[in-house]
Swiss-Prot record:
Chain's role: Has antibacterial and antifungal activity.
Transmembrane segments: none
This protein's name: Caerulein precursor fragment B4
GO biological process, one term: killing of cells of another organism
């Protein structure tokens, strides 16, 4: 559903932000 898509997008966005901030 739409909610699932939004949650998935937020998870991906969160990981992207963390990857950008942390020197991994």
């Amino acid at each position: 559903g739409l909610l699932t898509n939004v949650l998935g997008f937020l998870k991906k966005a969160g990981k992207g932000v963390l990857s950008g901030l942390l020197p991994l």
